[in-house]
Amino acid sequence: VSAGDLVIAHAAVREDGLSRKIVPVSYPATATPDLIIKLRSAANSAGINCHEGLVLTSDMFYPHEILGSDLPLWQRASVTAVEMEVATLFVICRLHGVETAAVLAIDGNPLNQDGGSMDTYNPNQDSVRNAVTTSITLALEALTG
């Protein structure tokens, strides 16, 4: 997964702090299957390639020089992307009976950063801006189309 790609999240690994305070971590953070299908359909109709699968919600997004990073572990476990909000949104929506899904615009890959340094991270790229616009378009199409 690279900057400018899109990811449709099926579910989120709950490595954040907030969702753990709402319900036990054994409670799954999942998207609504019908909305996943609608997002996929909107992407296919528009000829847009999207990655799909699990995402990692973590409040420690960047590697730390002392603690290191568990991102290689999650990559081996087939996690597609790292972000900071989806698990909490999925849990809260599920608890309140609200359908939910997420399409993410990828702005970089922390596994590609030299030695864990984020010095070369640059989300201000045309490919990322285009992905954000496309993700909004897909979400609107999935909800209204």
Where are the model-predicted features located?
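Glycine-rich phosphate- or other oxyanion-binding loops that anchor nucleotides, phosphorylated ligands
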Residues: 1-145
